[in-house]
Amino acid sequence: MHYDLCLTWYWEYDADFVHMLEAACTDRGLSLWQVRPHNLVEAVNSLFSGEITLGTLLNRAADNPAFSPFTHRVQELGFFCINPPEISHWAEDKATMHLELITHGIETPYTIILAPFTEQPLLPVLDLGLLGEQFVIKPAYGGGGEGVVMHASSLEQVMKARTEFADRKYLLQAQIQPQEITGRKAWFRVYYVNGKIYPCWWDPQTHIFNPLSADEEERFDLTPLRPVVAKIASVCRLDWFSTEIAFSKDGKFVAVDYVNDGIDLRSQSKAHDGVPDEVIRAIAAELVALAARHRQAS
């Protein structure tokens, strides 16, 4: 049995995205195999025995160790993976990506990178004044705000934060002050998938999304947003990801949260701080288009 697209997933809040993915597969005439906790053992057996083959893997269970035997076997068999694990792991290292982005001319906040606490428990002399009165402390790995300290202002906070994830590098970043446009912060969460870019207004305090329209891009001089995201895509080499860009008060488009692979796809119709449904639908369609293109090429 062969499936054009295999989706591994377990998070209940992915359900709306999965329904949209199913619809996109139906529209394209692609077969979809869903691997979930209830059929994981059976799926592993089918994959190892050769009973089932697949064209493309979309892994939404990368942070669940139980799925590792399945996804590792997919790699061993040479099936196409959207966001290959080795590239994803590299791209999600914020310290690495910070250096890559500035090398490629992308604006980022002023940043101090610290070695893991386990490697360097005693900090060197730091000039925190370069970060401004308040700054952000964040681990190099992780998402969803895990381990992030906003509005930090002291060395004591830095020392304490480093011990939470002691084996990870940490970033100290200057806080970016965005412009205000018609009463909204010029802060954007942007989705890149299969060469397409979907920008949204995003409030960093309330986490509320609104799609950024083409008219708004032109009217408010936000057209440089897309080339910045396209350049980030060329650097990180992921098939899909989200990023955060702020349009600063000094007129710069600044990447403030570089590359997120484990994208939260809760829908706005179900969660007030979810992603607009039309954006999720477009993402699903492009992921299926990617699988369809791979099917044609193979």
What is each PLM-predicted segment?
Residues L238-D250:
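A short glycine-rich, hydrophobically flanked beta-strand micro-motif that places a catalytic Asp/Glu
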Residues V149-C236:
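Phosphate-binding site of ATP-dependent enzymes
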Residues C6-L7, Q75-G78, S88-R184, T223:
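Active-site nucleotide/adenylate-binding loops and adjacent lid/helix of ATP-dependent enzymes
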Residues F247-S298:
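C-terminal active-site "lid" helix and adjoining low-complexity regulatory extension at the edge
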Residues F135, Y198, F241, V254-D257:
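Protein kinase-like catalytic core scaffold
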Residues W9-A115:
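Conserved N-proximal alpha/beta basic substrate-recognition cap immediately N-terminal to
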Residues S68-P69, R184-W187, W240-F241:
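Short, surface-exposed coil-to-beta transition loops
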